[in-house]
Amino acid sequence: MRKMFIFEFILAAHVVFCILIEMQSIIFPIQQKLVDLDNVGPVKKNTHANHNSYFDLFGFFGLCIWLLLKYFFEGFRFNSILIMAAYTFFFFDRALQFADKILCQVAAVLTILYIWTLISYPVYEFPKSTGKYRTCYKSIKLNDSYQTDTSVYYPCQDNKQEDIKYKWLPNNKFSKLIYELSILSTKWAPSEWIFDIGLSFLNFINFTASIEQPLINKELDVIIFSHGFSQHRNAYTTLCQQLASEGYVVFSLQHYELVYPWDIKGTKIYNTGNYPEIIEKYQKIRSSHLEWRIEQIQQLIDNLKSNKIKDVFYDFKPLSINLIGHSFGGASVLRVAQEINVNSVIAYDPWLFPFNQEQMHKQVKCRTLILSKDKNRIKQEWFDPKLLKEFLDFNTQIEHYKIKGLDHAYPVDLTYLIAAEMVLIGELRTDENLFKINNLISSLTIKFMQQKLFSIEENKQFS
């Protein structure tokens, strides 16, 4: 279901009205004016200066009011820059008074583009969980050496309680993380304020879960989820809630590595053609970050096994411990699986760049599934498919499937929130199969943990 932003359409209607009034002498050269502002209220005919003042006052204050309302109640998307530019051209046209209204025509084109993006580039509501259990959510801080912030999604008792809304973003730093990632990964990145504006609507994104209730059982299977690079602990809420609705207790950890790790502002780490010494330095930095992640996961496993989370769930006993991770998180859970034995490990398109040579050749100790994309977006040293092939050559027991149409961004919730923008920058090939691919990932994940066979239809999705 599409998420509606009312103030987007109000802004569009406001600027369309202003442009029509301003250009009515061109659009309707013979017919009577749509609105004769020369005779409105106290403004008298032939008082052109007063006419301009009245109209500019109306347009300017209308713009300010609607922009402020949108900012404080909905936030801006990247396409909001189009409507801001349309207003700018419109008021420049008013100030300069070009006879052919050329700037006003530019404003009209920008407004049409803006309306087109509202229709063509939707933001989707997070899909509802389809499992048989109600799901609850709580945010906790683990008593480990990192004081790790953790989101817990769990199946709870159904006492006909209400669902409540929770903020999707755990803090206000996400746009900065995405900006820093863009600096690293692209040849050119816009200014940070562009990201602050274009992603501010994420501050108003919520997900729903039941008000806090007891667990359905004191003995349940546990999943520890490790998020991808530059993401956060709530970034996979749709998947985590689906897993919780199937009867799993999901602990989604917050990792704290830096996105841009040093102060060489001109360094483009991810681009092809970097000097080997820079790539080597970057690999060592990310390798140290990988060790931080491993410590967080291992400490949570130890706490679960020794029942040291009584403040979260009293007298809870995990029936099994399973690890799931995406991208950097995928590498994290694979690395843990090389050191300790858990019930199962699932890695979504793991980013193996931080692995050293010894780790690339070390075997995992448990049942492991890797789901990866069928096609690389661009050639990048940091995501060379040869790394995964080399890892699998030394781990032949791992089940590995390439999924048709899968891009690296799946299964992040951003695929529902900024799918069109991700297509534009090449993170997604298309935004047409979002729900299908995310549902497939969820289904394969659950069946693997339950040791069930994939269906014939699911096997057809493997390349």
What are these regions, as identified by a protein language model?
Residues 1-84:
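Extended, compositionally biased non-globular segments that define protein topology
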Residues 113-222, 431, 454:
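Domain-level recognition of soluble alpha/beta enzyme cores
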Residues 168, 173-183, 187, 234-277, ...:
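Active-site machinery of serine-nucleophile hydrolases
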Residues 205-220, 225, 229-262, 377-380:
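Short substrate-entry loop that stabilizes the transition state in hydrolases
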Residues 216-217, 344-410:
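The feature captures the conserved acid-bearing segment of alpha/beta-hydrolase catalytic domains
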Residues 265-315:
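Alpha/beta-hydrolase active-site loop
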Residues 324-329, 333:
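Gly/Ala-rich beta-loop-alpha elbow adjacent to hydrolase catalytic centers
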Residues 389-463:
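C-terminal catalytic-base region of ester-bond hydrolases, centering on the histidine
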